[in-house]
Amino acid sequence: MTDVTVKSLAAEIQTPVDRLVQQFADAGIKKSDVDSVTQQEKEILLAHLNREHGSVPNKLTLQRKTRSTLNIPSTGGKSKSVQIEVRKKRTYVNTPEAEQAKAEEQAQREAEATAQKIAEEKAKREAEEQAKREAAEKAKRQAAEKEKVTNQQTDEKTKPAQTDKARREAEAAELKRSVEEETRRKVEEDAKRVAEEARKMAAENEGKWPEPVAEQTESADYHVTTSQHARAAEDENDAKVEGDRRSRTRGGKATKQKKGNKLSESKADREEARAVGRKGKRKPSTLQQSFNKPVVAVNRDVVIGETVTVAELANKMAVKGSQVIKAMMKLGAMATINQVIDQETAQLVAEEIGHKVILRRENELEEALMSDRDIGVEAAAEHRAPVVTIMGHVDHGKTSLLDYIRSTKVASGEAGGITQHIGAYHVETENGMITFLDTPGHAAFTSMRARGAQATDIVVLVVAADDGVMPQTIEAIQHAKAANVPVVVAVNKIDKPEADPDRVKTELSQYGIQPEEWGGESQFINVSAKAGIGIDELLNAILLQAEVLELKAVRTGMANGVVIESFLDKGRGPVATVLVQQGTLNKGDIVLCGFEYGRVRAMRDELGRDITSAGPSIPVEILGLSSVPAAGDEVTVVRDEKKAREVALYRQGKFREVKLARQQKSKLENMFANMTEGEVSELNIVIKSDVQGSCEAICDSLEKLSTDEVKVRIVGSGVGGITETDATLAAASGAIILGFNVRADASARRVVETEGLDLRYYSVIYSLIDEVKQAMSGMLAPEYKQQIIGLAEVRDVFKSPKFGAIAGCMVTEGVIKRNNPIRVLRDNVVIYEGELESLRRFKDDVSEVRNGMECGIGVKNYNDVRTGDVIEVFEIIEIKRTIA
């Protein structure tokens, strides 16, 4: 323990420093106010003070309750029964005299008990000896009687013998009497000796017993008694008081009590006083509270989680919320009392106020759950099949290539011939098994391609020999490099006449993909998905690359993997396509998957067959999750379903808190930008898709379409069919409903018809994005353009009583039309802009005058037309704007 100074010790025990120094001096320790005090010196001082002032005597507090019924006569003549409860409290103190008397009494009782026990043992032994002597005497008497009967015949002869017998009997009686007296004397001596030893023990214990001092309290009512007689007398006194009270009540002399003005007197005290009929003065009570304001600031240990509201932080520090907000304003942060702040901000605020911060890790339960897993550490890692992701630009033949390898017709089943989902398949070849992931090539599926690159071992980059490197090809290269995955290039459509593989190599080399023949690390294989050219070479190249990577995994133990895709099936519930990466996934396992959890109720392979287990690099569909997980979430098998549920709920709450904190922060930072939001048009959309990945891709693509004038707002999105809830949401928010590979049920269609909603179905993402663009274009404010349609040169000016100044003009360009807006130019400078009011040719009103003809032009509300001016006639054209 750290030593403290005399001054700090005096402040701690709230005593003057001079008095504490004097007490140390009395205890034989010389100290000044700046000297340090050790723990041993504290104990010496405490022992000295105990000797001087003594210790608090031991005390015992007893509480008693008595209940009775009091009949009070009322004005109506009927008596009123009142329940009376009297509570009494007695405190008994163990004083030195009581302790001494108790010790002597105890010693005396022990001595008496010991003496009684010894006496009983002596008496028992004496009784046994007496019984033996009586038996011997009885035998002697019987022998004597027998001898007497025998010698009766010779009475005369035996007279001297009888005299001897009487003498012997007298001697035996005298001996018996002397033995009894000796025994009684010994018992009395033993009892005296035991009593003397008991008194000596009591005297020794009296010296060893601690000497208590009476407690120095003025208000305590201590009854120093422990005997049964004292308690009996007290009970008699209570009964007497109660009897007097009853007699006074029956006599109708209930005493009025004075109303006290003590705020501290309770209703129970008043009832007790009324019951016992007290007339005397009540015990005065103080009206001040016992709380003393802390003199020194209290420094607390504040435990802060990853996120906390301002109100919770103030509660932890025992201060008002306004004080926390004030401290945050000093640090340059604005917040409300219900706002969620992050851990770093809360730490700065708590330290600013002066408290010690303890940062808490809130994912302890998750760490404990993950540590309690059988991951098969003792088992040896075995070779596993490579996971190959096929990437490339749209329509470059990725699915067709995989289709030829699998010998199925997957490409024909895709809407529009393009892949909308990540397809996961494993293929058995002659040289081993390969797992393929087919990713979409459309720009909208960027996140799906990135997800495929994270879960893969090898990327097969498909490039069309006749098309070359395209934008999605470059994006696929970036994903592969970010994931640090080797790339095998498949130059497809090599059978076309316009194929140019060398151009593909040259273009890819600009992005860091160098072929092996040029000294690089990437294998280039020329293939044709239609003709089947180079397929075996491609598979061998993949297996060769996998052999170089030495891919291994533990097959035993609890499995973990990644969600490739997920969707909601109407009959089966949430379905997730999972790629197992470690261990073995069995039917019935408890899995934790992102925000969701559940037990694997069924497992199916890519062909729809039910299976019971799946090892590393095997893609499977699992059923039994609580909801549809997000694609890309990690799947982990755990032991306890209850803990898995707690972790999933914690993750959901954590995600919500972080999202809310991020929204609050962005609101404050973008305050000025949000002031102009009222001028922006919004297109509200509700999106429902068949799988999670497509839903994400569509939402990202539509949000990227937002401009400064039209903003796309995704009101709702989800997986599964369009329900009545979706239709109601769209009706409330004025949104259009877009279904991607899903349909609306009967109740939803009924709401759509009733509310007149716009419901559209799509199976190709191109069409969906194009139509949303058209809808956004219709919401744009129109753009107007001025187009000059004719020029007329003023040759002469003459007056008209009806129109004023009339300009005689020659049309030099275009056509002059009546009632069109015009400009008057003088020296190529616009001096007036107005409207053409009158157009005549040979005194006839005409609607238009063409190039090379003369006409008279009257300008509305303008008479300052001069010779040499140019009249420019134009029209305003509305240009329809579109979203780029």
Swiss-Prot record:
Binding site for GTP: 392-399, 438-442, 492-495
Basic and acidic residues bias (residue ranges): 99-209, 231-246, 262-275
Role summary: One of the essential components for the initiation of protein synthesis. Protects formylmethionyl-tRNA from spontaneous hydrolysis and promotes its binding to the 30S ribosomal subunits. Also involved in the hydrolysis of GTP during the formation of the 70S ribosomal complex.
PANTHER family per record: TR-TYPE G DOMAIN-CONTAINING PROTEIN, TRANSLATION INITIATION FACTOR IF-2-RELATED
Protein name (record): Translation initiation factor IF-2
Phylogenetic lineage: Bacteria, Pseudomonadati, Pseudomonadota, Gammaproteobacteria, Enterobacterales
Region: G5, residue numbers: 528-530
Principal location listed in the UniProt entry: cytoplasm
Domain annotation tr-type G: ranges: 383-552
Stretch list, region G4: 492-495
Positions of region (G2): 417-421
Family indicated by similarity: Belongs to the TRAFAC class translation factor GTPase superfamily. Classic translation factor GTPase family. IF-2 subfamily.
Presence of the UniProt keyword Protein biosynthesis in the record: yes
Polar residues compositional bias, start-end: 216-229
SUPFAM superfamilies: Initiation factor IF2/eIF5b, domain 3, P-loop containing nucleoside triphosphate hydrolases, Putative DNA-binding domain, Translation proteins
Listed GO CC annotations: cytosol
Bias (Basic residues): 247-261
Annotated region described as G1, given as residue ranges: 392-399
Subcellular location: Cytoplasm
HAMAP family per the UniProt record, alphabetical: IF_2_B
Region (Disordered), start-end ranges: 93-288
Sample GO molecular function, one term: GTP binding
Annotated keywords: Cytoplasm, GTP-binding, Initiation factor, Nucleotide-binding, Protein biosynthesis
Region (G3): 438-441
